[in-house]
Amino acid sequence: MSALSVIEQRLLKWDKLASLVPKSKKTPFPIDRLNELLKVCANSSYLRIGESIHAHLIVTNQSSRAEDAYQINSLINLYVKCRETVRARKLFDLMPERNVVSWCAMMKGYQNSGFDFEVLKLFKSMFFSGESRPNEFVATVVFKSCSNSGRIEEGKQFHGCFLKYGLISHEFVRNTLVYMYSLCSGNGEAIRVLDDLPYCDLSVFSSALSGYLECGAFKEGLDVLRKTANEDFVWNNLTYLSSLRLFSNLRDLNLALQVHSRMVRFGFNAEVEACGALINMYGKCGKVLYAQRVFDDTHAQNIFLNTTIMDAYFQDKSFEEALNLFSKMDTKEVPPNEYTFAILLNSIAELSLLKQGDLLHGLVLKSGYRNHVMVGNALVNMYAKSGSIEDARKAFSGMTFRDIVTWNTMISGCSHHGLGREALEAFDRMIFTGEIPNRITFIGVLQACSHIGFVEQGLHYFNQLMKKFDVQPDIQHYTCIVGLLSKAGMFKDAEDFMRTAPIEWDVVAWRTLLNACYVRRNYRLGKKVAEYAIEKYPNDSGVYVLLSNIHAKSREWEGVAKVRSLMNNRGVKKEPGVSWIGIRNQTHVFLAEDNQHPEITLIYAKVKEVMSKIKPLGYSPDVAGAFHDVDEEQREDNLSYHSEKLAVAYGLIKTPEKSPLYVTKNVRICDDCHSAIKLISKISKRYIVIRDSNRFHHFLDGQCSCCDYW
């Protein structure tokens, strides 16, 4: 059925309802008929017609007597379902007498509007007034509001209260009770409640499992699932979907395969929702080809399944494949939704493809998802990671609603672009709006302090503000402090901090300190740190490379040879440097000394041209990092054809003069390329942005935004 047909049917229904509303204000209309009309208006959100009926009841004096409670309850139901909670409460407060339906309708109204605290407050008023005895519907609403607001202690008190009234025997009360315990406690309390219940069916176990899944208590969720197996329950569709979701989060492929086999055996694998759960599970378990097979075998293609398979490729870091799937979609038959756009924009962000991101932004605007928070967050992320922090700011400013993810994305984006002060200003604005920072927020803030050398302020955020906002520091926060201190040249403080910190350091922390030693030329400490890190993490290639670079900078060629020999003996492979640039909606990828590109001869000629132009400006090849066992000329050639230089050269050939270039590299940009590209930006009068594994480098007129520290 087309959208136009739906609208036409809705208008016909509206006209029919409107014709039934009494026109005479003096003649009472049959009450039963009016109540039926109010019910239809409430369920269809026809507020204006409902208001007309309310007006008729007032003028015919049918809404102020105690015996008219049924009509008033119908009106309360209308207003709460039309999100007019304040008007519903006015009616409720003016009622001469209230019954349990009145209380329950008002509670549900508050709950549907997200005011769970008001629900619990209203229940307490009902309980202490003694006007009405709670029933199973009231108990369900109360337990649900405890779940929504995380008020487990109050929930336990209400549990005792409803036990006294004998309401726990009702199936849906039991289900919401168990869900509350599993969601809010996150421990074995729900299982203990299950054991204490006189009767449990599959729906109760499903509620417990759903709660544990929501709060991330996957071990307890697995215990519940085992109980369902021990009780010999016949699983239904919900059980299978929940179990797949559980195994997705546990990344337990073996158990997931057993469930998939069982689904096939009992015919539960053909439903669209089940196929989506299977695709999601295989994607999370790193088996994207299995996910593709499930997708290919599904006959009912829709946006839910298309988005799920794209997400599977996104989880697998196969970002280009996710984008290719979208290009094959018939967007007229299967229009993208907010989840589709979020996955696509985040895939583009990981690939740093600004032009493609701009095109997709246009489609977002056409599709009407401009004001959706999830899409807005993805747009900010895409522009920030694609090198245009200015467009990220515009996307951020244009958002009608923002959440913690929005602020975190903006703070992190500014930080990675080296705009530390702007990141800290965004943090201050976030606090001013009342948003509560989380662990991700403080990672961005501490990195920002590190980029601009705000040591004291960074330590204040770490020691004071994180405690104030009840954020427990983890390994990433501690590593940020190591970077903050060592980048400022405070190596003694960094060593003391690492020695006394109450955590076990990982290889990233040691690499952070080692990189600072390399950049700050503290080679003595660098060698000491590298030797310790190699002993503890013998398979991490990054540590070997940094140690080799330290030896090379010191002209200790024997040390370089020793490190490379050690890597060969241990089978440790250096991650190859790869750079890419987007030209006319196509991505061009380059390796060092690449000879695979169809225009490589032209590219090499351009490299030679620009290198000859920058030498008179003071460029001197940094041959320390090149192979020492070849002659000087060969070393210079090796450096000339690094992947980032090839990408920049291709951009200079293929883009209009004075247009900006955006290049991405998978590892840290080398010292020689950094020096060269600074001067290339000067002679070409180009704005060149390079994103490496550490940060963004904005090259303009012979300078870089990183101030030669990265």
Curated annotation (Swiss-Prot):
- Placement of PPR repeats on the sequence: 35-64, 68-98, 99-133, 135-169, 170-200, 201-235, 236-270, 271-301, 302-336, 337-371, 372-402, 403-437, 438-473, 474-504
Which molecular-function annotation in GO is an example for this chain? zinc ion binding
Where are the annotated coiled coils located?
A: none
Stretches for region Type E motif: 509-584
Keyword Repeat on entry: yes
Tell me the protein family, please: Belongs to the PPR family. PCMP-H subfamily.
State the protein's name. Pentatricopeptide repeat-containing protein At5g39680
Can you name the source organism? Arabidopsis thaliana
